[in-house]
Structures are given as C-alpha cells and as structure tokens.
C-alpha cells in the first residue's frame, strides 16, 4: 500500500495536514475487471497510481471551496521490501520523461549518520553484482537523517 499525507505550507512556515489516506488498490485489474491489490514491490505500473490519485488530484481551499489547490511537489519513500527501490527508480524515470522530474522527489532514511539533515545523492551500482535496484547515477535520491528530523518535529510540538 501507499500511505499518503498531503501537507500545505503557509508563507510564514506554518503547515497544515490537508489530507491523509491509504492507497490499497492498483490500476491493474484481474480477468473479471476487479481492481487488484496494490503491490509496489512487484509491479512497476502500480506506482502510476501516485500520479492519478495524488499528484494530479486537487483539494478545495478551506477559505473558498470553489478554489482548488494542487500539489507543487511530491516526496516518495523509495525504501522498503525487495523490489520497492528498483520500482521507485523506474517510476521517477517515467516522471522525468514526462516532464515531472523536478517536482517528484525520492527519499529514504540514511543508514549513515551525517551532519546534514538531508543529502542529495545519485546512486550508481552499475559495477556491482547482486543488486536488485538498477541505479546508474541518473536518479536523484534524497537521504534523510530520520532520528534528527524526528527530534526536530518533536521539539516543534512543544
């Protein structure tokens, strides 16, 4: 499944949760036309639901419901079970091909402690065998210092 949270930001740094929902059904269907359960690790095409059900969606403004708000950018967690990272990279490459590469960002928790909270990398495993994800240095991946970021969020709540 994909867990979606849409967050809006104000001009002074304030933020609001606009929507939160789970995507559990794929755009794929079985022989009876029934929607299949989503499986981001096994089916690269399942990632396309992030475009139809998140990126291209709009939400009414609280101050004027006749006005619609759309996403400026979308961050997607590329980590998880085997197959997820490779399919995330394939998804981002399709987005780049369609002109969305500068508005869709792949993230994952960093396994190395660094001073910077967020580090942009370009994974390249072309010379390494036994890797499921095909990374050729063409996909930007943002590594997050998850513990430090959680501490900041927690401190902001007080």
Predicted segments, located by residue:
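RNase H-like, metal-dependent nuclease domains and their acidic two-metal-ion catalytic environment used
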Residues: 1-111, 139-158
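A generic signature of intrinsically disordered, low-complexity regions enriched in glycine/proline
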Residues: 81, 114, 128-129
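Extended repeat-based interaction scaffolds and adjacent low-complexity, acidic/S/T/P-biased segments
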Residues: 110-121, 132, 136
């Amino acid at each position: 499944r994909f867990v979606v949270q849409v967050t809006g930001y104000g001009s002074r740094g304030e933020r609001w949760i606009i929507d939160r929902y789970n995507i559990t059904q794929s755009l794929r269907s079985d022989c009876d036309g029934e929607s299949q359960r989503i499986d981001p690790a096994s089916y690269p095409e399942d990632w396309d639901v992030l475009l139809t059900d998140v990126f291209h969606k709009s939400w009414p403004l609280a101050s004027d419901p006749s006005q619609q708000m759309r996403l400026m950018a979308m961050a997607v967690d590329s980590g998880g079970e085997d197959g997820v990272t490779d399919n995330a990279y394939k998804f981002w490459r399709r987005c780049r091909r369609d002109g969305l590469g500068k508005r869709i960002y792949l993230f994952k928790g960093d396994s190395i402690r660094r001073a910077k909270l967020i580090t942009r990398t370009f994974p390249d495993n072309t010379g390494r065998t036994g890797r499921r994800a095909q990374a050729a240095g063409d996909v930007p991946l943002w590594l997050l210092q998850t513990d430090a970021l959680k501490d900041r969020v927690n401190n902001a709540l007080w």
